[in-house]
Amino acid sequence: RDTSVTGVQTCALPIWQDRSSMTKLIVFDKDGVILDLEATWLNSAIAMTHFVSELTDGRHKPKAFQAIIGIDEETRQIDANGLFAAGSSADQFREFVRLEPALEPLLLHDAEIRRQIRSIFLETRNATLEAVGSVPNGDVKTPLKSLYKAGYQLAILTNDSEDSARQSCDDIGILPYFNMIVGFDSGFGSKPGPKGLIAICDEFNITPNEAAMVGDTYADFGAAKAAGAGLFIGISNIYPDCPDALKAAAHLLPDLSGLPSLLAKHAT
């Protein structure tokens, strides 16, 4: 494997093989790739677990629900393989119900409870934004601008909502670079399902093997593989403690800064 591009880590025995002849479309995950996941959403997730604990009348403490989704309120650590980092809210709720079956009618079927949870997430996020703003995952504007000017089609595929993703990108001044944004609520399901990535390819009239997926979790890797993407590029600054799926990626970068040069080299 070629690891001469600055920032590319070597991972043993990759199972992903590049299948693209020419990359025309680059599809990005949002949280953990474009935005700093901890700074943007951790407070919201913590608040949500406290609310769910209250729904059990305190039978289960917030810490129990935090453990299920892979976060720690005290240390502010996030499990890169956990449901908070990689799953959707539906995935998280299903696991909460496994712990406490009495939550099923509330979390899975009660529209008012789900509305309250969305409000908690957004209100806590807005408080975070007022305090620190949307926090990019390093310098993302420079590489995205470079890729945009190079003629690539750019899109976002996230397990967050489409509106939230659009707002976050607008907050940090990168929204004009993206031709399409797809969230879990855009009608194509969530990752690791392939429908969102396939829909983006269809929108631009290209085949999946002409697309590259850039992500930081098993959900991103799984979506790329299931859709038949030609290239997957992992983003993680914690190698070798990165998500297990990323260790199977053909390319692994610490952030987006090295992406333009990697793709330029890949095209030659």
Language-model features, listed with the residues they occupy:
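Single conserved hydrophobic/aromatic residue that forms the stacking wall/gate
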Residues: 1-15
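Asp-based, Mg2+/Mn2+-dependent phosphohydrolase catalytic module
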Residues: 14-26, 39, 54, 141, ...
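N-terminal helical cap/lid subdomain that shapes the substrate entry/recognition surface
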Residues: 23-138, 148, 166
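Conserved phosphate-coupling serine/threonine residues in phosphotransfer and NTP-handling enzymes
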Residues: 33, 158-160
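Residue-level "hotspot" positions that anchor or transmit function at local structural transition points
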Residues: 4-5, 84, 135, 188, ...
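Short, flexible loop segments at the rims of nucleotide/cofactor-binding pockets, characterized by
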Residues: 130-134, 159, 188-189
